[in-house]
Amino acid sequence: MGKKDKNKKGGQDSAAAPQPQQQQKQQQQRQQQPQQLQQPQQLQQPQQLQQPQQQQQQQPHQQQQQSSRQQPSTSSGGSRASGFQQGGQQQKSQDAEGWTAQKKQGKQQVQGWTKQGQQGGHQQGRQGQDGGYQQRPPGQQQGGHQQGRQGQEGGYQQRPPGQQQGGHQQGRQGQEGGYQQRPSGQQQGGHQQGRQGQEGGYQQRPPGQQQGGHQQGRQGQEGGYQQRPSGQQQGGHQQGRQGQEGGYQQRPPGQQQGGHQQGRQGQEGGYQQRPPGQQQGGHEQGRQGQEGGYQQRPSGQQQGGHQQGRQGQEGGYQQRPSGQQQGGHQQGRQGQEGGYQQRPSGQQQGGHQQGRQGQEGGYQQRPPGQQPNQTQSQGQYQSRGPPQQQQAAPLPLPPQPAGSIKRGTIGKPGQVGINYLDLDLSKMPSVAYHYDVKIMPERPKKFYRQAFEQFRVDQLGGAVLAYDGKASCYSVDKLPLNSQNPEVTVTDRNGRTLRYTIEIKETGDSTIDLKSLTTYMNDRIFDKPMRAMQCVEVVLASPCHNKAIRVGRSFFKMSDPNNRHELDDGYEALVGLYQAFMLGDRPFLNVDISHKSFPISMPMIEYLERFSLKAKINNTTNLDYSRRFLEPFLRGINVVYTPPQSFQSAPRVYRVNGLSRAPASSETFEHDGKKVTIASYFHSRNYPLKFPQLHCLNVGSSIKSILLPIELCSIEEGQALNRKDGATQVANMIKYAATSTNVRKRKIMNLLQYFQHNLDPTISRFGIRIANDFIVVSTRVLSPPQVEYHSKRFTMVKNGSWRMDGMKFLEPKPKAHKCAVLYCDPRSGRKMNYTQLNDFGNLIISQGKAVNISLDSDVTYRPFTDDERSLDTIFADLKRSQHDLAIVIIPQFRISYDTIKQKAELQHGILTQCIKQFTVERKCNNQTIGNILLKINSKLNGINHKIKDDPRLPMMKNTMYIGADVTHPSPDQREIPSVVGVAASHDPYGASYNMQYRLQRGALEEIEDMFSITLEHLRVYKEYRNAYPDHIIYYRDGVSDGQFPKIKNEELRCIKQACDKVGCKPKICCVIVVKRHHTRFFPSGDVTTSNKFNNVDPGTVVDRTIVHPNEMQFFMVSHQAIQGTAKPTRYNVIENTGNLDIDLLQQLTYNLCHMFPRCNRSVSYPAPAYLAHLVAARGRVYLTGTNRFLDLKKEYAKRTIVPEFMKKNPMYFV
């Protein structure tokens, strides 16, 4: 029997010494290793991984082991760049052009993630503070010692598949864990050890065979990803410990015989799992700490033991599914606030498997393996069994298990509340039934729900159903559909009777597998169970329909007439509850508040007096002068027409199409063969109009007019209009909706209390329970970059902003630019003060010199009149005199911004910078001038600033960043096309961009002409850089979740085809930027003077628990919200051919949020996507003045930007 080892000071773990026969064999293998490493042909034959060969090797007798002590690493400090250290030496080598890890020892070289072998000997690596990528390629390691240590800011440490015989493997993960994995392979009779430090990066030991050697890896403070592949372990010790902020610890499938497997996860983990396998002869124990939430042990066979579970204070959910448990001991303890601890089905016979998860446990997993006849404690182990055959070549890496997407690890750890409620689906039936509902007539649809409810009670025996209000309903019981009386009668609020015919029938595939929601979570299949999700979504909306007005997924509660919040022009703001069924690591209900403007219900006469005329109506009031502003409000609105009592008819609802051409006293129509005026007609019916001089409302069609007197109409209550709000409405709505996170949460909780989901019979019948408070998840706060200006001067970013403080722009253009200031000199009305105008010009010149912009001090001042032709004359003169810039001061009325941009950029090719006259007259201060100069320098093809070089991001200098966005017309502009905007960088810093825009069919999401757009961007990149990019990072904005496949199959295909056409093969990473969602972060604490809205810090990342378990996805708040609750941006990575590490991608994305040229603040999403939005907005400016677009190609040709202007000033659109 092996002796117990004593631990050394300094945190070293014990290891059993090999037998003399083993030591002799190991010494021979160490002598052979240099020769084996000098076989470059192995690098060229990755196929060997797919063609394993068998070789006979005898396992040493392991019952005669002697204790030995593990030697500490002799390297001190750490290397700054990622590299490889072997044989006690440090070797630093990394390709500076990104995503390529290179290793040289002797004549062996590894490039571009190629893994190769190592046989025997001693392998040691230590990575320093900012380490990036440390890799030890696969090979055969027989009877040696492998050790790796990663330093403070870890990154990526990897030991690929090989054969390791008779060693020691141990894994310890520190405070901010991340990801610890042991994939498949054969490990016999040894000890494997790895230690990951505080914020661990990525440490990996892929599959191989280990017999009687020693392998040790230690990762330092900010590591992140530690992996040890699975294998066959006979008589060894495998141990993993994860520290405070756990993350993800995994041991995949393999055969483990006669050893000890132990895992401990620390404070902030979240998900601990041991998948199905065969474990013989032992003890399995799991403990989850304070903030667990969900502890599960699925079905399996456990022989010889005890199963025990304890749930703590705020436990949440603890489950042990059916299985056979005979003997053995399985124990799980869940702490104060739940989490998720799972041990899937398997066979456990004897053996000892232990896992402990700390306060907020992350993710600890031990996949299926075999552990027979094993009993030992930490530091002591035995092996029994006959020697086994070994394979000469390592087995191929197994496919990554579903749901094991690598998550980020770097950053300062923390916690935050998320507006997600846990859903308990444990009592949900296994199936539901889907039925098609057909209701005739099709209009009015707003009474469908009332008619269906009557049908449910009368014809379906009051069956509990979930109806979506349109064409589907769901039930957990089969419905009796044979005998139906399809006709029902309903009465509206005005007493009008409506008859509907309802038909219900089963769909083609009526049965819905509701258990697929559980299967999705447990088995981690990659396809969402969409039908089951749709069913649950309809069920969860059931309690809201009768209490609120539904708009999309939001339910708006009617306002109190005595306490309404009025916006402008007759609108009020209503607050509604948004809810959506979500699948992350478990089912959630996403809840948030929504704000929407609704027309205020009031008589039309009151509306005219308060908002349109803003005066009392009398006998002389005329609507001709107000018609231009009144009709846009009236068109499409519903009014209730209340006939006079003498008509003896019920009120009716009509939709307004506009105003009549003439007042009621003059407008005529045919009645009894005569033409009569509307006023005389009502007078003949004993109702003389009070205001016959007012126009009537036209509620008929274009063919047949129906005219109603305004004084008999009122605006219908609760209308959700699908129209664009005016500028004043938007400004007032933002002020009203901008609240702190504390106030926002209080509003959400009040609405949840109002709707009472858990008391709804439909939700109860489907076996769903909803939690009462937000979930709490782990976060990481990324470090902000340093911003670099001219002469290598740097400034720190604090709370999402920074100051220049005397610094100069990084790269201004040295030429003295000729500048002109244009101002409006109307023929009549107020004129600009020339002194203010001159002061403004002098400030532009003086402050421009201070930041290194060279503007000619001889400024030209030119007035223009109300006539647009005067602008044409001035622009033509400036073009002839070779002026570089025209600063145009825009009056509040008369000449518009759109007109100026169209003339300057489409006709004359003049660079313009517009500023409002009000700003020049009232706000002309240093800050305003500084912000204008930021735009001017970028437009003149200068670079304001860049991010300080980061050794972890070497690929930045040969990367083209592409941002794309598609803006669509508002719903009331159906004939206006969509505008595509694509911006692409062409400099080493990601600071200078060129643009392309296109017109395409309205509401078309994918970009049709991406091939030619990419070709043009590649041409410009080659022109500036004399080479094509090695990497393309594509940030795509404005895409809904359902459009992801189209983007990947169409837009990315076009990008690749364009690259093929010019003969380059860049690695492509495509990131979808999603802003339209309702996920919000709610930190604890109260409002402070420095954080008056109580938002999270810029750089806060969430990439666990609430994200899709099978996709590379993360949320990030990259900005400091000026007002209201900060909205995180969601990023979905749908293509990553270069295998860009998630930590690097998150830091790179955060850095790019500091590269927006318009301001010295970080913005809410990366600069490429933001600039693409500006491109699309500029394309929409070019459409102003045209209402019909019959031929988009011809219309686009009319709006071609002057080519030489675009070449000289590629960032003119900023």
UniProtKB/Swiss-Prot annotation:
What assembly does the database describe for this protein?
Answer: Interacts with Fmr1, Dcr-1 and vig to form the RNA-induced silencing complex (RISC), a ribonucleoprotein (RNP) complex involved in translation regulation, other components of the complex are RpL5, RpL11 and Rm62. As part of the RISC complex, interacts with Tudor-SN. Interacts with Taf11.
List the gene name. Answer: AGO2
Q: Which family does it belong to?
A: Belongs to the argonaute family. Ago subfamily.
Q: Where would I find the Piwi domain in this sequence?
A: 885-1186
**Which segments show compositional bias classed as Gly residues?**
118-131, 141-154, 164-177, 187-200, 210-223, 233-246, 256-269, 302-315, 325-338, 348-361
- Look up the record and name the cofactor or cofactors this protein needs: Mg(2+); Mn(2+)
* Swiss-Prot/TrEMBL keywords: Cytoplasm, Host-virus interaction, Magnesium, Manganese, Metal-binding, Nucleus, RNA-binding, RNA-mediated gene silencing
In terms of CDD domains, this protein maps to: PAZ (cd02825), Piwi_ago-like (cd04657)
Positions with biased composition (Low complexity): 18-93, 107-117, 270-282, 362-394
Identify this protein by name: Protein argonaute-2
Q: From what organism does this protein derive?
A: Drosophila melanogaster
Which GO terms of type biological process are on file?
Answer: cellular response to virus; cellularization; defense response to virus; dosage compensation by hyperactivation of X chromosome; miRNA-mediated post-transcriptional gene silencing; negative regulation of viral genome replication; piRNA processing; piRNA-mediated gene silencing by mRNA destabilization
Give the result of residue 854 to T, as annotated.
Answer: In strain: 128, 130, 138, 140, 141, 186, 187 and 196
What does the UniProt record report as the effect of altering residue 740 to P in this chain?
Answer: In strain: 130
The UniProt record lists the PAZ domain at 608-717
This entry carries the following GO cellular component terms, namely: cytoplasm; cytoplasmic ribonucleoprotein granule; cytosol; neuronal ribonucleoprotein granule; nucleus; RISC complex; RISC-loading complex
Region annotation (Interaction with guide RNA) maps to: 681-686, 1075-1076, 1119-1127, 1156-1178
